[in-house]
């Protein structure tokens, strides 16, 4: 039977047995562009897809599954769209179909048959993967300081965790009895998980180490899998530091960390372990780096937590595409068997394919001189609603 030698989160005093020293090396490794990670399509299009799915959900919630542009034209911030809503919808004719409304010839939108079918498939995935999605949310909360997170944090992580937009609106259906809505300080509403100390929660790194060794694993045996970019060579000093870092005891993100010296090497390894586990929970195993900064207070992260990505480029990759910095966990892409594929990823890839089909449709329209599709409203008709 597999087991792992590690203190439970409820036993805070045991971590005092760890030797907490600080041998800080000012690691600076020149950022090296990696075309493979810069061109992972579902990461590149994730932000735009999020807006597409949010608008899709807004439309299907309507009684007739269609909506006038006037009802959503002022909600660019809600849907995280930087252009006019109508312009954004028209960019994806394979997903959103425009037609003349019942009154005043105003533009309305509904889903195309292809998008409607994909929406159905998406709902099936949510139903069949309900336990998986709930466990991912539970693990996120169990990594927090007191097993509780503000609802605003949970809401902000929904897309990354693969949860539906309305997930928290139906707690009786989506959450089990271990979840509780609580009042936090300053009147903030939170979501807590009651952990009874029964089955120990193991990180992906712990599970993989146990599988590899087929038995009990000590803390010193758990190392981070490294996946350097091609042509990347480290200076001897940095290589020596990295070897020593790997030998440090592993502190699971689900274990108590209150007695760790924040300036110790072990504390840094704990932060890297937290980021590794966090990205393992996410659909694309990636996230905009700035979106993770709000987690510092609730997960005991240092002020300069973003430096962890820079100090460990063989574990994480920072992509600068789309004028933003995206942190990507290398392991799931270089060793596909190491991390389970998120159940929602397949559906998102299908939405992205529809987005790509839209580009072909628009290109075909541009190439057809004088082409005008009947039923498509003149773009000027919605200007009054887009001001």
Swiss-Prot record:
Keyword check for Transit peptide, yes or no.
yes
Q: What is this protein called?
A: Protein WHAT'S THIS FACTOR 9, mitochondrial
Gene Ontology cellular component list: mitochondrion
Q: Where is the transit peptide?
A: 1-24
Q: Where is this chain's protein located in or outside the cell? A: Mitochondrion
Starting at the broadest rank, the lineage of the source organism is: Eukaryota, Viridiplantae, Streptophyta, Embryophyta, Tracheophyta
Role this protein plays = RNA-binding protein involved in group II intron splicing. Binds specific group II introns and promotes their splicing (e.g. rpl2 and ccmFC).
Q: Does the keyword RNA-binding apply?
A: yes
User: What keywords are assigned to this protein?
Assistant: Mitochondrion, mRNA processing, mRNA splicing, RNA-binding, Transit peptide
């Amino acid at each position: 039977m597999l087991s792992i030698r590690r203190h439970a989160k409820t036993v805070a005093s045991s971590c005092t047995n760890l030797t907490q020293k600080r041998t800080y090396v000012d690691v600076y490794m020149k950022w090296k562009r990696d075309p493979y990670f810069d061109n992972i399509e579902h990461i590149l299009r994730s932000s735009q897809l999020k807006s597409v799915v949010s608008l899709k959900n807004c439309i299907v919630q309507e009684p007739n599954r269609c909506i006038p542009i006037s009802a959503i034209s002022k909600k660019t911030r809600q849907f995280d769209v930087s252009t006019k809503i109508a312009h954004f919808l028209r960019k994806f004719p394979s997903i959103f179909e425009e037609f003349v409304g019942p009154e005043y010839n105003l533009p309305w939108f509904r889903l195309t048959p292809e998008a409607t079918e994909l929406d159905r498939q998406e709902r099936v995935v949510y139903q069949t993967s309900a336990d998986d999605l709930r466990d991912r949310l539970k693990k996120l909360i169990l990594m927090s300081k007191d097993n509780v997170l503000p609802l605003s944090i949970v809401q902000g992580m929904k897309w990354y965790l693969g949860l539906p937009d309305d997930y928290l609106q139906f707690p009786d259906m989506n959450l089990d009895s271990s979840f509780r809505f609580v009042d936090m300080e300053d009147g903030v509403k939170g979501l807590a998980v009651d952990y009874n100390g029964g089955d120990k929660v193991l990180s992906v790194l712990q599970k993989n180490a146990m599988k590899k060794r087929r038995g009990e694993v000590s803390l010193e045996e758990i190392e981070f899998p490294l996946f350097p970019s091609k042509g990347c060579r480290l200076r001897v000093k940095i290589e020596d530091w990295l070897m020593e870092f790997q030998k440090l005891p592993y502190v699971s993100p689900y274990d108590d960390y209150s007695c760790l010296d924040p300036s110790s090497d072990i504390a840094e390894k704990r932060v890297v372990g937290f980021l590794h586990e966090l990205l393992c929970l996410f659909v694309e195993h990636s996230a905009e780096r700035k979106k993770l900064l709000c987690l510092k207070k609730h997960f005991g992260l240092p002020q300069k937590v973003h430096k962890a990505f820079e100090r460990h480029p063989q574990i994480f990759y920072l992509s600068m595409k789309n004028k933003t910095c995206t942190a990507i966990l290398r392991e799931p892409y270089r060793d596909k068997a190491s991390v389970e594929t998120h159940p929602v990823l397949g559906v998102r890839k299908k939405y992205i394919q529809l987005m790509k089909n839209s580009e072909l449709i628009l290109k075909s329209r541009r190439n057809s001189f004088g082409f005008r599709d009947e039923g498509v409203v003149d773009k000027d008709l919605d200007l009054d609603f887009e001001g």
